[in-house]
Amino acid sequence: MSALSARVPLANSQERYLQLRINERRALEEYLAQLRAKFGGHIQHVILYGSRARLSGDQESDLDVLIVIDRDDQQLANEVADEAFGPSLQHGVVISPLVWSAEHFQAHRRFGLLIYRNIEKDGIELWSDKTKLPLSSIG
C-alpha cells in the first residue's frame, strides 16, 4: 500500500474520481493509456491532486497530475509531460502534468514540503507501480 492510499481510503478516492466530469475522466484515462504504452516501465505513480481532486474546482480548472518516474531524466520527464497535450485537446480539458523523479518525490515526503502534504491529503492515486492498473470508471 502506498503512503497516499494509506492516508486516503480507496473508496473515498474512487468516489471523488467518479464525480469528475466524463470528459475529464476520459482525458485522464487516455493520458494514462498513452503513458502505459510508451513509458510503462518508468512510471511509479500517477496522482490527481489540486482543486479537481478535492472537487472544489470549476469548469475552468485544470487537472493537476503528478507523475513519478523511476529516474532523474529531464528528457523522459519532458516526453511524459508532452503526452498530456493530445488528450487535453481532444477532450476539452487542460491536463497540467508535474513530473518528478522517485528521488525528488521521496525528498518532498522526507522534508514534509507543502506540495507533498497537499498531494498526500487530497490526492487520488490513478496508477501505482504496485498494480500498474489505473482507476477505470467510464461506463
Q: Model regions: which residues?
A:
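Catalytic core of pol beta-like nucleotidyltransferases
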Residues: S2-H45, A53-Q59, I69-G139
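Short beta-strand->loop micro-motif that forms the acidic, two-metal-ion catalytic signature
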Residues: L63-I67
